[in-house]
């Protein structure tokens, strides 16, 4: 037996023994009927569920899983068999970690060291968009204890600057914290835990991606391994000495298609492309990205702070704040304006008023960007404008919330001390606009107005009239008023059988792609993810069925889906990928539909959580009665139009109801003459079971009670 396979089998046997003992101890302590589950997931023990189809619900379900684990450890002198033993280690790690949640207060809640443990389903779904757009180009797993903490911190910071999502296991967590690495889900540097078994929590992220986005069926191990290898851009870095358990865990990663880079010399035990040494930490990042085939588009900007999507979630507390621009205290606005070519001076950057080094804490800020180009259209102004929020947030030490004339920007003391000034904000806008919108923008000029009088004049005389004009245009834009819709296949890198059809009244289910966005995407990249669908061959106006849409869907999904309707949830509903903001599902007792947002973790009157509802669709599957969609679609006049429209909505979580309430009430008033329609819609503060829901609807005389049966 080779040294490598000997280490793998030794580690898998050790984990198998620990797992069996831990299961027996737990059953002796709590009993076989004691419930066990990871928090906020519809996929039970995800590794076991995906590989075998077994739904672990109680401790009594685990001994059989231990038996499966042992069967994978054959001790044969064969690398493929040894990799299976690595999968056995993954199963064992999942069981050991799962047992930590058998306690009333799980081990991660009690831990004195940082580590989030299990990653809930909603977080994975929220990562769908940044993964498919490339904002998160890859996933790194960093584990162990480096001989030099500064070295591993540099590696993690490098990943962070490149947008790579990094999960950490072991002493590297403290080493990075001591070196000043900023951590947290929002910063995409995530400490999982100290035990090596905690690595399973990133493994289950990859596995649930296959179930959520890829429609891989539970029990299809071959399909699972194919999906993770081809579609999940993950890799592993180990630091410091490695024992047989770490080697065995690495074998499990390799079986999933994730290459492992270690910082010790493995000599002849290396497996080219799968297990390689890199003893020079300065080369670790380059080697890892090359092995996984991840290409990073470098953004070298003339600014003194790091710039990456990983900083988009950074929170700047008041105590850490140097200056602030906030509409509650001063005039603020952001506007992109199209001009003629001779009216724009390319790369002209103007700061009109005091810069942030004048000593004040708060300032006015009117951001005006003039753009010109032969292919530029006024409709693209708002598309570019909405990107300002992301670009400012990409700067380390900057926090931006809101848009238009209602926003808040904070700059940290640390960023200020590094030299960040308003000129750098202007540089970011110029470089990002001319890079990302180069197909339509030939010249770009940026003005940042901090003079309060001039900023107010710009807001009143230029910005507000432009906002109002756009709003009037959007309000008049309906599916009937345009001659084409657009496909969006951004999510196909994760969900190959899914394709969105984006219309003026139905944005992409992720909530991030409007009809104007799709139109701009097509203009920027005619061969890209959004393609026009000429609105021809209407077969059924009620359901929104078109021959051209069906042809486009069949082509975009490579025949996986042949027909969709745009306005029905019961007849060939549009498919979903998995990163939808909300899901609507039938509630038979009331003859209506519930709408649930992914942030809601509680029970619904349908008897299912969001995750359980979402498992009914996703991955390009059409399930009549269930449909993923964006938040803004809820108040659309086209929302489940074929089934009667929004008057079928009977329940939604309070946070969602409050968010869409104003728009939803306006639509209900226009369509049905109903005032305050949301008062007729129940939420979790009123009921979470179907009997109480029906009683509430009867009390409110909800219009759904008089509609035709759905089935």
Could you tell me what each predicted segment is?
Residues 24, 28-31, 44, 48-49, ...:
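Cysteine-centered metal-binding/redox modules
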Residues 1-389, 407-408, 566-573, 668-669:
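Acidic, serine/proline-rich low-complexity intrinsically disordered regions
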């Amino acid at each position: 037996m080779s040294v490598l396979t000997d280490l793998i089998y030794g580690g898998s046997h050790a984990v198998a023994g620990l797992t069996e003992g831990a299961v027996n101890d737990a059953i002796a302590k709590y009993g076989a009927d004691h419930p066990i589950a990871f928090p906020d997931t519809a996929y039970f023990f995800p590794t076991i569920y995906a590989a075998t189809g077994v739904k672990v619900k109680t401790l009594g379900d685990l001994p059989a899983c231990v038996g499966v684990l042992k069967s994978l450890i054959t001790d044969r002198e064969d690398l493929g068999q040894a990799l299976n033993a690595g999968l056995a280690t993954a199963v064992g790690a999942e069981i050991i970690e799962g047992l930590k949640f058998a306690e009333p207060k799980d081990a991660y809640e009690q831990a004195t060291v940082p580590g989030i443990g299990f990653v809930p389903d909603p977080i994975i779904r929220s990562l769908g968009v940044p993964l498919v757009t490339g904002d998160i180009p890859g996933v790194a797993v960093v584990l162990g204890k480096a001989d030099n903490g500064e070295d591993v911190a540099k590696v993690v910071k490098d990943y962070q600057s490149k947008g790579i999502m990094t999960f950490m296991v072991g002493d590297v967590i403290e080493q990075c914290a001591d070196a000043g690495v900023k951590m947290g889900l929002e910063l995409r540097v995530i400490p999982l835990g100290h035990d090596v078994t905690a690595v399973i929590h990133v493994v289950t992220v990859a596995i649930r991606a296959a179930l959520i986005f890829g429609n891989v069926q539970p029990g299809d191990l071959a399909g699972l391994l194919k999906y993770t290898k081809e579609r999940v851009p993950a890799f592993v870095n180990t630091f410091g000495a490695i024992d047989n358990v770490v080697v065995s865990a690495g074998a499990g990663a390799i079986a999933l298609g994730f290459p492992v880079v270690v910082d010790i010399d493995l000599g002849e035990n290396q497996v080219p492309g799968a297990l390689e040494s890199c003893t020079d930490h300065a080369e670790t990042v380059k080697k890892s990205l090359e092995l996984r085939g991840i290409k990073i588009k470098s953004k070298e900007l003339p600014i003194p702070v790091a710039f990456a999507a990983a900083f988009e979630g950074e929170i700047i507390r008041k105590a850490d704040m140097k200056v602030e621009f906030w509409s509650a205290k001063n005039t603020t606005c952001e506007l992109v304006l199209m001009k003629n070519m001779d009216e724009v001076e390319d790369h002209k950057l103007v700061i009109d008023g005091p810069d942030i080094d004048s000593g004040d804490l708060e300032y006015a800020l009117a951001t005006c960007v003039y753009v010109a180009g032969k292919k530029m259209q006024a409709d693209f102004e708002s598309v570019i404008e909405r990107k300002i929020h992301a670009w400012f947030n990409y700067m380390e030490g900057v926090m931006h919330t809101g848009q238009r004339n209602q926003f808040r920007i904070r700059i940290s003391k640390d960023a200020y001390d590094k030299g960040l000034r308003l000129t750098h904000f202007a540089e970011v806008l110029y470089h990002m606009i001319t890079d990302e919108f180069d197909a339509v923008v030939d010249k770009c000029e940026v003005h940042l107005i901090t003079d309060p009088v001039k900023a107010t004049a710009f807001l009143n005389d230029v910005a507000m009239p432009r906002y109002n004009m756009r709003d009037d245009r959007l309000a008049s834009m309906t599916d009937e008023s345009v001659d084409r819709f657009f496909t969006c296949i951004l999510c196909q890198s994760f969900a190959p059988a899914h394709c969105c059809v984006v219309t003026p009244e139905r944005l992409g289910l992720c909530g991030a792609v409007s009809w104007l966005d799709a139109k701009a995407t097509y203009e920027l990249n005619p061969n890209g993810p959004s393609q026009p669908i000429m609105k021809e061959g209407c077969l059924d106006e009620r359901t929104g069925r078109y021959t051209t849409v069906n042809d486009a869907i069949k082509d975009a999904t490579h025949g996986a889906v042949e027909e969709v309707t745009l306005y029905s949830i019961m007849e060939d509903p549009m498919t979903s990928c998995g990163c939808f903001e909300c899901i609507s599902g039938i509630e038979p007792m009331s003859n209506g539909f519930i709408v649930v947002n992914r942030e809601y973790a509680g029970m619904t009157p349908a008897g299912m959580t969001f995750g359980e509802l979402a498992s009914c669709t996703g991955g390009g599957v059409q399930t009549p009665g269930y449909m993923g969609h964006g938040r803004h679609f809820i108040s659309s006049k086209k929302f489940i139009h074929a089934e009667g429209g929004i008057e079928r909505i009977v329940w939604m979580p309070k946070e969602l109801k409050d968010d869409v309430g104003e728009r939803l009430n306006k639509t209900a008033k226009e369509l049905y003459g109903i005032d305050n329609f949301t008062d007729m819609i129940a939420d979790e503060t009123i009921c979470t079971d179907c009997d109480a829901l029906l009683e509430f609807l009867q009390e409110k005389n909800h219009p759904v009670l008089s509609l035709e049966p759905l089935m």
